[in-house]
């Protein structure tokens, strides 16, 4: 969600749709507030179709294409759309990745420009991104192991609205570790552990 320079005076309009209804939306809203990004430029919404990866991608597509007048979201009013979800044990994980890839550059916004449509997946879960702020993780993790995050953040609670404030001082380390994981596992069809959250922060 970093500021773009040169191409235009304002930010790209970004839509982020997440699997979770608290943890991920709160994290991205906290970043938006920290960097004083206007809500008109960065819209963060949980999926209303369900939490399966394919449902998250489908909801992101529908919200982009149709908008939502009840939420004051205009049709096709974004340059970038991100669908954020976990691998977990979801059967639709690979279908969601494929659908997002098929939409990238194919949908056009209200300025008739092709948009970026990207799946932001984490294996096993979003908490891996937070854990990377404190640990250099190379081996696969069980979902429950990710909760050792509480060793670094006593009292950590999923959905709390202060995760970015707590972990922010270690952002550079997390970014470096996440990018290293992506390179290490780029040849694998099923990378683990992995998180693309770094692409948004």
Predicted regions and their residues:
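Phosphate/oxyanion-binding active-site loops and adjacent basic polyanion-contact surfaces
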Residues: 20, 24, 49-61, 192-196
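C-terminal accessory helical subdomains adjacent to catalytic cores in phosphodiester-
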Residues: 1-15, 25-47, 66-201
């Amino acid at each position: 969600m970093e500021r773009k320079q040169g191409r235009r005076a304002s930010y790209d309009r970004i839509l982020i749709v997440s699997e979770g209804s608290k943890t991920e939306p709160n994290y991205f809203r906290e970043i938006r507030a920290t960097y004083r990004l206007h809500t008109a430029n960065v819209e963060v919404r949980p999926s209303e179709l369900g939490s399966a990866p394919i449902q998250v991608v489908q909801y992101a597509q529908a919200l982009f294409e149709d908008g939502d007048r009840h939420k004051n979201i205009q049709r096709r009013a974004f340059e970038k759309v991100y669908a954020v979800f976990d691998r977990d044990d979801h059967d639709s994980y690979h279908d969601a990745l494929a659908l997002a890839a098929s939409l990238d550059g194919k949908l056009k916004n209200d300025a008739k420009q092709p948009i970026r449509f990207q799946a932001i997946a984490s294996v096993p879960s979003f908490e891996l991104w937070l854990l990377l702020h404190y640990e250099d993780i190379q081996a696969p993790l069980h979902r429950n192991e990710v909760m050792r995050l509480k060793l670094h953040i006593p009292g950590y609670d999923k959905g709390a609205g202060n995760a970015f404030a707590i972990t922010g001082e270690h952002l550079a380390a997390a970014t470096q570790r996440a990018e290293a994981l992506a390179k290490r596992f780029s040849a694998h069809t099923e990378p683990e552990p992995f998180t693309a959250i770094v692409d948004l922060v």
